[in-house]
Amino acid sequence: MGTNATKLETGTAGTLLQTGIERKIEPSNILILLDCSNTMQLALDGSTGVPEERLAAAKNVLKGTLRTIPSDVKVGLRIFGNSNLRDDSCKQTFLLVPIGLHNRGEIVAKAERLKPRGLTPLAYALKEAAADFEGLPGERHIILISDGADTCHQDPCVFIRKLRELGFKMRVDVIGVDKKAKIAEGWQLECIAKESGGKYFEADTAAKLGDAINQSVLEAISQKAADHNVSGQVMPRPAELRASPPHKLEKSK
């Protein structure tokens, strides 16, 4: 795993976001797709326990990186997993915060309540995520943070290829937070990025996770990267896609 991971120079993307970059004319829409499955309670180095639990590190990093994203960029949050094992565990994905403006505080607040549990319905989550962009002009850009492959016997790469065949352009940058994941899992995550025209990053520390998110955002909004990103008119969603309503989490006990 990780042979094709994008190499990052620590801190460069975050600095560029803060100091200013040449922006695209076309609007950018960014959806953070966050893995909340059971294994996200493990440490970033693959061992159990503290100090850098994968989901906790992701939530902490998001607090900082969201502040660096320009206020006119639309951002949203969808999660998958985050449920006790049951018959419908392979359909557990929720749009917690729809893609929009002036919602950074809401994203941070709702992310803070998340706990790692359940399976990894990655393919189903990507299908639902694609529908989240319906009606939005501009580019579709997903930042997927995950520690492994789909555990619901689905292949997300098949779905991404299908979208491409249908002419539905959606870039997925993938941040893998388990450096010790099995080869098959690493291949699946890298495949999602490759097939969508995105990039794959490895992040085994909180610092690397932050750099990867900043780099992905930079790619989404900078004019320099425009030729590599997917173009964005308002397109009707393919018939295969259906959207779920925003989900309200019940208070944690």
PLM regions and their residue ranges:
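Loop/turn elements at helix/coil->beta-strand transitions in domains of secreted/extracellular proteins
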Residues: P27-N29, S71-V75, G135-H141, L166-D173, ...
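DG-centered beta-turn motif at the end of beta-strands
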Residues: L34-S37, A58, L77, A129, ...
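Short beta-strand-loop
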Residues: L42-L44, D72-K110, A131-L136, H153-P156, ...
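An active-site-proximal "capping" alpha-helix that borders the catalytic cofactor pocket
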Residues: E52-D72, L77
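VWA/integrin I-like adhesion module and closely mimicked acidic/polar interface patches used
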Residues: R113-L114, G148-E195, E202-D204, K208-A212
